[in-house]
């Protein structure tokens, strides 16, 4: 069993979906957690309440990650709260489905700032804290299968997920000399709020289920085990890697 006792973990977008599942998975194994969230106070409170049952410290910070300066202040708040940060999960992301020809500059920039720019500067600040405290930290960026495949109504989103992987590759090189391992997790089609409306079309949902080789779409909880391994001290040599967790969707071309 992976042990995170005494570790301090920061998870962006930790009030719902994959971020929530990973945050609670870390708390269950002994990590103190601090989550960012955008709007849903009651959901963030529920995460903290559940985490506290595991005997760990749990904190929340409300953040607008479309504002890079607010994202930087969030990172500084996390450092102020914990002193030392051992784990960072860059999870927060948005995907407002839209036709390519209708995507405005404002919409593109908002998706870019939340999905890429905020994580760039949060990671920069947290990684510096790890180095200053001589922590062999772990950083995980939540990318997507969409970094490898196109989406008719996701041209802005797929762009950001490819960029996130490029960022991950580069900082894995930068931070390796300090004992900090950096990877990305690429979920397939997961049943979360981000695609709830899209998958309300039963025909579309059935098609997506058939595309997997396991015969079902993923749940946020399916992402916990691979994430926790990459974030654990048991991971001693995996860095700069994109781990695809998609139920076999990408390989299934039939």
UniProtKB/Swiss-Prot annotation:
Biophysicochemical property: pH dependence: Optimum pH is 7.
Catalytic activity annotated for this protein?
L-rhamnofuranose + NADP(+) = L-rhamnono-1,4-lactone + NADPH + H(+)
Give the residues the record marks as binding NADP(+).
13, 15-16, 18, 64, 91, 157, 161, 190
Give UniProt keywords alphabetically: NADP, Oxidoreductase, Rhamnose metabolism
Coiled coil, from the record: none
One of the record's GO molecular function terms: oxidoreductase activity, acting on the CH-OH group of donors, NAD or NADP as acceptor
Point out the annotated site residues (description: Important for NADP specificity): 16
Instruction: Report the superkingdom from the record.
Output: Archaea
- At the top of the EC hierarchy, this enzyme's class is oxidoreductase
- What do we know about this protein's activity with respect to temperature? Optimum temperature is 60 degrees Celsius.
Gene Ontology BP terms: fatty acid biosynthetic process; rhamnose catabolic process
Pfam families noted in UniProt: adh_short_C2 (PF13561)
Q: What does this protein do?
A: Involved in the non-phosphorylated metabolic pathway of L-rhamnose catabolism. Catalyzes the oxidation of L-rhamnose to yield L-rhamnono-1,4-lactone. It can also oxidize L-lyxose and L-mannose, and uses only NADP.
The name under which this protein is listed is L-rhamnose 1-dehydrogenase (NADP(+))
Upper lineage is: Archaea, Methanobacteriati, Thermoplasmatota, Thermoplasmata, Thermoplasmatales
The gene it comes from is rhaD
């Amino acid at each position: 069993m992976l042990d995170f006792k005494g570790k301090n973990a920061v998870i962006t977008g930790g009030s719902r979906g994959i971020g929530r599942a990973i945050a609670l998975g870390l708390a269950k194994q002994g990590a103190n957690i601090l989550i960012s969230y955008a709007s849903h106070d009651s959901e963030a409170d529920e995460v903290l309440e559940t985490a506290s049952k595991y005997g760990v410290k749990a904190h929340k910070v409300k953040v607008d990650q479309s504002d890079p300066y607010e994202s930087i202040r969030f990172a500084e708040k996390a450092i102020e709260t914990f002193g030392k940060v051992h784990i960072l999960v860059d999870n927060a992301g948005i995907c407002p489905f839209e036709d390519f020809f209708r995507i405005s500059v404002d919409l593109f920039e908002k998706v870019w700032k939340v999905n890429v720019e905020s994580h760039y500067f949060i990671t920069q600040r947290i990684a510096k804290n790890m180095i200053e405290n001589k922590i062999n930290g772990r950083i995980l960026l939540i990318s997507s299968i969409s970094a490898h495949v196109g989406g008719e109504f996701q041209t802005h989103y797929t762009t950001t997920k490819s960029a996130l992987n490029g960022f991950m590759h580069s900082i894995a090189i930068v931070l390796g000399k300090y004992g900090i391992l950096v990877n990305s997790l690429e979920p397939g089609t997961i049943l979360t709020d981000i695609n709830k409306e899209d998958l309300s079309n039963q025909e579309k949902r059935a098609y997506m289920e058939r595309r997997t080789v396991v015969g079902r779409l993923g749940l946020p909880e399916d992402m916990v085990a691979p994430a926790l391994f990459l974030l654990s001290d048991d991971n001693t040599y995996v860095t700069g890697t994109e781990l695809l967790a998609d139920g076999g969707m990408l390989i299934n071309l039939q």
